[in-house]
Structures are given as structure tokens and as C-alpha cells.
């Protein structure tokens, strides 16, 4: 058994052994007070509103980060909660099995070092990440719900394509 396969066993065991939904978290970068912290950390630790605690309803089973921030917390949280930080979106969605192995995808593409266009819009790779998600869905012959933080893309054409893929492959898509 290769080291990588061995290190994926805790996430696979967690996913296989519970009736809870398994979520792949895809992030551009993950640090305190980032959008990834606001979303992914709540899926790990739950959250409080007023005096009521809301436990996480599902399990994060993999994390992909496009960039590692100098004050990264993604690696520490992955280690603490027992899921792998992977090097590709495909690995995050397949857990190393070669087929779709999660029940949902969180796409958090906000923050990080990305270029700006002539309108001073930061070109976060939401479309590019989403395209890789879709490739896994197509290869697997099935799809799962996707949540995309913020709007879909800075480009109308790219946003429309993302919407069209969700209709074509019949998966729920939420953004906001």
C-alpha cells in the first residue's frame, strides 16, 4: 500500500461508516476570517446563534486548497478532524477511488493572490474549479449538489456555462 493510499483511509472509513453526508471542501485559501473559515469551519465545529448550538449536519471528508496562506488553518483543521488535504479537485471528490465518493461539494473561491482585470475585478478561479468538478461528475456518470460561495463568476459567459452544466447534469446548484 502506498503512503498516499494509507493516509486516505481515515477519510474513507469516516465516509463509509456513518450515515452522515460526506462533503468535499474546495478552497482558494483558508485562514482565520476568510470565507473558507466562515463556511468550512462551521461544517467542522458547528456554530451558535443566540444561546443555541447547531452541530454540523454532515462531515467534511476532504479539503483542496489552491493556495496556502501564510496563516493557513486548513492543514491544522484537517489534521485535527482526520481528513486529507489533497492536491487536486479530482482527489477531493473521489477520495482516491477514481469515482465520485462524496455527497456534496462546497466551493469557496474568495481570497487569495489572483490577478485583476481592467475593471479591477479579482479573477478568482470559480469557473476553473467548477469545470473540474463537472469533469469528475461526467467521468463518474453521476453528480451531487454544489454550493458556490459568492456569485458564480466575474464573466457572464462563464457563469452561464456553470448554470448550464448544472441543468445538463441535473445537480442542485446554489450560490450566494
Label every PLM stretch briefly.
Residues 33, 42-49, 95, 108, ...:
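Structured segments of extracytoplasmic/periplasmic soluble domains
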Residues 84-92:
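Short acidic-hydrophobic, aromatic-tinged amphipathic segments that line or gate anion-handling sites
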Residues 26-30, 64-68, 108-110, 149-152, ...:
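Active-site-proximal beta-strand/loop segments in catalytic clefts of secreted hydrolases
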Residues 105, 112-176:
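Beta-strand-loop-alpha-helix segment that lines the small-molecule cofactor/substrate pocket
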Amino acid at each position: 500500500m502506498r503512503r498516499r493510499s494509507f493516509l486516505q483511509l481515515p477519510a474513507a472509513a469516516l465516509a463509509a461508516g456513518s450515515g452522515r453526508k460526506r462533503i468535499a471542501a474546495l478552497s482558494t485559501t483558508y485562514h482565520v476570517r476568510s470565507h473558507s473559515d466562515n463556511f468550512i469551519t462551521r461544517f467542522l465545529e458547528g456554530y451558535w446563534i443566540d444561546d443555541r448550538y447547531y452541530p454540523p449536519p454532515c462531515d467534511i471528508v476532504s479539503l483542496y486548497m489552491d493556495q496556502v496562506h501564510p496563516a493557513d488553518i486548513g492543514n491544522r483543521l484537517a489534521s485535527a478532524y482526520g481528513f486529507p488535504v489533497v492536491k487536486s479537485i479530482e482527489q477531493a471528490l473521489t477520495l482516491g477511488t477514481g469515482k465520485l465518493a462524496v455527497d456534496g461539494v462546497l466551493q469557496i473561491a474568495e481570497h487569495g493572490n489572483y490577478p485583476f482585470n481592467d475593471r479591477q475585478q479579482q479573477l478568482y478561479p470559480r469557473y476553473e474549479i467548477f469545470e473540474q468538478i463537472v469533469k469528475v461528475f461526467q467521468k463518474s456518470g453521476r453528480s451531487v449538489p454544489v454550493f458556490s460561495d459568492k456569485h458564480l463568476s466575474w464573466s457572464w459567459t462563464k457563469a452561464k456555462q456553470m448554470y448550464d452544466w448544472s441543468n445538463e447534469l441535473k445537480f442542485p446548484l446554489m450560490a450566494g
